[in-house]
From Swiss-Prot:
Belongs to the ferrochelatase family. Its EC number is 4.99.1.9. The keyword Lyase applies. This is Coproporphyrin III ferrochelatase. It is found in: Cytoplasm. Coiled coil: none annotated. Pathway: Porphyrin-containing compound metabolism; protoheme biosynthesis. GO terms for biological process: heme biosynthetic process.
Length: 320
């Protein structure tokens, strides 16, 4: 079989929980048109003149609270996913590489490594279950730019999404069932997804529909459990997808729901948005509003059922 490789891609992370490391990461991330599509002449002066002066120290302090002995949580868990999938695919001689859309290891460096190995068939697997132009399309763009100039282009297979993949849903089901068995049934389960600007969905991004399809599939598996969804991590003043997760939580308290469990099905690996925004900030707000118990259910990370999903996504694209 021709040399086949899988490139796993997640969003990215600063190299250290310090302002000087956060600043270039945010510059690359927020400077990407796929993320913020405002005219460059309008947006870049705001980004470099205000945001990159103010936000890095604040963001660095948050990273310091969640940083692991192994380093960045997102990178650590992504490497565990890479290693677990590599072990599954090793017998077929398939190599698994890891790249980040922003920061290191970059998509370009991962592809250069695979080029040196002699890759002839490349499967790109963005670690975003629900497609969005802000994430998945950004991966596509990075891959094409990195391959620009290669005279020995490999065959490319790009896996767009997997919002209702049976093995992905099996992981979500097991995570929720395990929680209920250990901690008891919550008054409500909140599924929180990263928000995006409403203008993006209006222009064709089907992210919201995919988030709803994942939520509906989870509801089908737990018909007796109250399940609501929300969107988190809004940035800027433009209208973003709603309802906001923090408002959903406040409304649950107002309607007598004192015990909630919160899960983020759109995040394949725990990161700043889950480990701090969801697990810490929203928990504090929930209790302050009158809630009594708030539990965050961890992301997939290297859970075997999620690795089953990644393996299946790869194997279905291999030659028979």
């Amino acid at each position: 079989m021709e040399k086949t490789a899988v490139l796993l891609v997640n969003l990215g992370t600063p190299s250290a929980p310090e302002p000087d490391a956060v600043r270039p990461y945010l510059a690359e991330f927020l400077g990407d048109w796929w993320v913020i599509d405002k005219p460059r002449w309008q947006w870049l002066p705001i980004l470099h003149g205000i945001i990159l002066r103010v936000r890095p120290p604040r963001v660095a302090k948050i990273y310091q609270k969640i940083w692991l002995p192994e380093g960045s949580p997102l990178l650590h868990y992504s490497r565990l996913q890479q290693a677990a999938l590599q072990q599954r695919l090793e017998p077929e001689g398939i190599r698994v590489a890891l790249g980040m859309t922003y920061g290191q290891p970059s998509v370009k460096s991962a592809l250069e490594e695979l080029r040196g190995w002699g890759v002839r068939r490349l499967l790109v697997l963005p670690l975003f279950p629900q497609y969005s132009s802000t994430t998945t399309a950004a991966v596509w763009s990075k891959v094409q730019k990195a391959l620009d100039g290669w005279r020995d282009l490999p065959e490319q297979i790009f896996i767009r999404d997997f919002p209702t993949h049976p093995k992905y849903l099996a992981f979500l089901t097991e995570r929720i069932s395990g929680y209920i068995a250990e901690k008891g049934r919550p008054d409500a389960l909140v599924l929180s997804y990263h928000s995006i600007p409403q203008a993006y969905t209006a222009s064709g991004d089907d992210y919201a529909a995919q988030c709803e399809s994942t939520t509906d599939a989870v509801r089908d598996r737990f018909p007796d459990l109250k399940i609501v969804m929300g969107y988190q991590s809004k940035f800027g003043n433009d209208p973003w997808l709603e309802p906001a997760t923090d408002e959903v939580l406040r409304e649950l308290v107002r309607t007598g729901h004192r015990h909630v469990a919160v899960m983020a099905p759109g995040f394949a690996a725990d990161c700043i948005e889950t480990l701090h925004e969801l697990e810490v900030e929203y928990a504090e707000e929930f209790v302050k509003a009158g809630g009594e118990r708030y539990d965050y259910l961890p992301a997939a990370n290297d859970h075997p059922l999620f690795i089953d999903c990644l393996e299946d996504l790869v194997r279905r694209h291999l030659p028979r």
